[in-house]
Amino acid sequence: MDKPVVRISVRNLVEFILRSGDLDNRGGSSDREAMQKGSRLHRKIQGRMGSHYRAEVSLKYKTEYEDVSIQVEGRADGIFTEDGQCWIDEIKGVYADVSQLEKPVKVHRAQAMCYAWIYAQEQKPEKIGVQMTYGNLDTEELKFFREEYTLEELGLWYQNLLDRYHKWIAYQLAWKKERNASMSDLEFPFEYREGQRKIVSGVYHTISTGRQIFVQAPTGVGKTMSTIFPAVRAVGAGLGENIFYLTAKTITRTVAEEAFSILKEHGLKFKVITITAKEKLCFCDKTECNPENCLWARGHLDRVNDAVFELWTTQDSYDRDTLLEHAKKWQVCPFEMCLDLAVWVDAVICDYNYVFDPNVYLKRFFGEGTSGEYIFLIDEAHNLVDRGREMYSAHVDRADVLEAKRLAGDYSKGLVRALEKVNRQLRTLEKECTEYEILPNPGAVSLGMLQVMGEMDKLLEELHGKELPEQLLEFYFCVRDFLNIDELLDENYVVYTEMGEGGKVILRLFCVNPAANIHRCLEKGKSAVFFSATLLPMDYYRALLSTRKDDYGIYVTSPFRQENRCILTGRDVSSRYTRRGYEEYHRIASYIARTVWTRKGNYMVFFPSYKFMEDVLEVYENEFSAEWVRCISQTSGMNEREKEEFLEEFSASEGTLVGFCVMGGIFSEGIDLMGEKLIGAIIIGTGLPQIGTEREILRQYYDKKGVNGFDYAYRYPGMNKVLQSAGRVIRTQEDTGIILLLDERFTGKDYRNLFPAEWSDRGNCTLNTVEEQLGSFWNRIREKN
């Protein structure tokens, strides 16, 4: 049997094995201007060296181990001969004053040494030299560092470097054999529910063919296990490399962790990590990742490889508590250790942004030029539309530019000049803007922001180790975001200006259709599964989440008996803005009262906004309160503890509890209140988003595309919130409950066409008949039991 071949670039090898020192995020990033300047500087230096200088020489060398071949490859910046001596040149562009550099950076020297060793295998010289050339990106001033090595010295050094890397590869290969063997008899851990087998086979086939699939399956089918199980089997069969389970909310990450745990209880060996937000993993009050403010950042790079290797080789599940405990033991940053460990595991559970967000994505997996046989399982995929628009949009506010200019005065005249230029450009746009103004492109602002970024990067490098005002640093990230999105502008964007609250103009790059950007990310892997209980209408979600024409689609009907739940539409009530007022609030409050009086138990009432909820709640408490009914309400900005306390009320309640909530909020999706914990959901209105600039831009954009702009901007997003809220009731085969839709618009064809197939038994009611109809349903349930 042939040995596997592992390929790694020279740069990745030395930056992984030889990294050392502190973690420090105070330096600048590689912005477009710096990269362009660096490329120009490389070409200039290479051009000056004469005909004897060979630039960009491709080199590779394979080293044989008993279990694996490791091929190290890359391109040397330059190779030349001087006085009979061969030299390998490594060129680095920096903003720092090169005259102040005392010695080359360790990993830069190591890159040159690797190239020297590989090149020497062909030429066999007695000695070979390495030259580190540092050039200032602005002044183009150069400084050279030279060192000579014998072939024996280089050989010993290179072998030691590769042996340290081989340790990781050897364990990885041994683990994969053990992992794959554990799957030989792995079966689905439960008796298949109706629809589950259809999902499992559909997902496995999709992965095996390298395609994408959209799975619409109602709450309670068991979508999590039905997608994870076939993905795991596909990895074991060599059809995929890593699983990325992507979620929008913390609670769905927990469900995924539980699914993997159940499979492990049935014999699966699989390493699974959950990436938690940096703020939730940080030991410090503020996430200031530098050696002055964080003990864990000090010397982090000296210790992190040993920390990761120990955790990786001794455990298989890595949740927040495990990561924090291990990071404390090794005195390293838990978040950075988590990201490093993620490279070596079998499955990563994380938020959408670690794959899709251009500012946050895992560069270890999805950086430029990197890809793999990744399987993407995208949970609650309906959320990815708005999240995608948010991740791929950016803005610059003239008020922020002026504040940054004020703060920059103490640091850099060049930055002040660049900011004033952008300010003038925005002021010109401001004069032409009333409510909002659609533009063909950002115009000169893009170039101005590029110059600002260059000046800020220069400043950050010069100030290395010193603090900048927090507001100025935040503006730096705003500029970076703007430039990243500016590169993506195409027909899927609308560029527009609007007036901010402070009377200053805001220039926005608004992604109206995120499908192309999402597609570019998913192309880094092999296959993707989009699944949700509310992917209706499926064509809408396909249009906004995928550009492929060959995607599969599966519709799974509810496995639960229709007779266990009652769905009614109140046809004499409305939540339209034109109807809002005491009379309608009183009617809605009366509906709520008559519903909860019909049977003792727990109910949730979902409103389109906090204001609407508060207005109806006030009427309800003043005119319909009863001793045996207790009301609680969702508040804006609830933290995790408050959210848990709210949900605990539904477990502890023995009488009748009514939770007043907001559609599209934290209680309208991703929560499990089974059995008697929740027996009814009352949904007020059609969930239409509030009319605003971006919604109107969406409506106009899709009207021009020849589809119904109102549907795309308002009706479909609103109906999704309705379906999610309704999905809180009936979570298991034994559950019984009612769903009450309070808005006359639900009786119209435009909305009826959006109802899932299992709502075919939906009936209509009025305020005068609702008690009788619900009472009849509950009597049937009592008689059956």
Task: Give, region by region, the residue ranges found by the protein language model.
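Metal-dependent nuclease catalytic cores that hydrolyze phosphodiester bonds in DNA/RNA
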Residues: M1-Q85, A110
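Signature of the SF2 helicase/ATPase Hel1-core->accessory helical subdomain module
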Residues: T227, T254, K328-A347, D351-M456, ...
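A contiguous, basic/glycine-rich beta-loop/short-helix subdomain that forms a polymer-engagement track
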Residues: L323-V348, N359-F366, K458-S574, R579, ...
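Walker A/P-loop
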Residues: S208-P230, N242
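Mg2+/Mn2+-dependent nuclease catalytic core
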Residues: Y61-G155
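Conserved RecA-like P-loop NTPase helicase motor core
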Residues: R571-E583, T635-F746
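A substrate-engagement module of RecA-like helicase motors
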Residues: L186-E187, L239-V348, F356, R424-T428, ...
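Conserved pre-motif I regulatory segment
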Residues: A174-Q216
